[in-house]
């Protein structure tokens, strides 16, 4: 998918999220292969969606955007893979390995009141201290001091 089509899809996804969440939508971050410029024909579009008042359980959160995801599959043949989190899920005490992966390449699609930018500024010293490393064989991030 070329950059123009990706931008159109991301803009449409943003508009649908604004309709769905209203004022509860905080940020949408593109990450993964499309953000890093390494996407191939069947790559999915990885998105971190930060919103308030989400269901508590992860399985229930997945259902929140299911209709929108299916619509993009049918209309464009593209799989959007949103991960929904609440602002409180982004702790300063422990960094989720997902965040380490996102930091390898991301693009801010929407960031109300600079929530994501401010979060990144606050976690910089933590990231430097914990020194996350990617374990290729396991395809996951680990904290250097713990391995």
Swiss-Prot record:
Mg(2+) 1 binds at residues 44, 46. It comes from the Archaea. Mg(2+) 2 binds at residues 44, 46. Keywords: ATP-binding, Magnesium, Metal-binding, Nucleotide-binding, Nucleotidyltransferase, Toxin-antitoxin system, Transferase. It is an enzyme of class 2 (transferase). GO terms for molecular function: ATP binding; metal ion binding; nucleotidyltransferase activity. Its cofactor is Mg(2+). A motif (GSX(10)DXD motif) lies at residues 32-46. It catalyses: L-tyrosyl-[protein] + ATP = O-(5'-adenylyl)-L-tyrosyl-[protein] + diphosphate; O-(5'-adenylyl)-L-tyrosyl-[protein] + ATP = O-[5'-(adenylyl-(5'->3')-adenylyl)]-L-tyrosyl-[protein] + diphosphate. Binds 2 Mg(2+) ions. Pfam families: NTP_transf_2. The keyword Nucleotide-binding applies. InterPro entries: NT_sf (IPR043519), Polymerase_NTP_transf_dom (IPR002934), Type_VII_TA_antitoxin (IPR052548). Belongs to the MntA antitoxin family. Putative antitoxin component of a putative type VII toxin-antitoxin (TA) system. Its cognate toxin might be MJ1304, which it might AMPylate. PANTHER family: NUCLEOTIDYLTRANSFERASE, PROTEIN ADENYLYLTRANSFERASE MNTA-RELATED. This is Putative protein adenylyltransferase MJ1305. It comes from Methanocaldococcus jannaschii (strain ATCC 43067 / DSM 2661 / JAL-1 / JCM 10045 / NBRC 100440) (Methanococcus jannaschii).
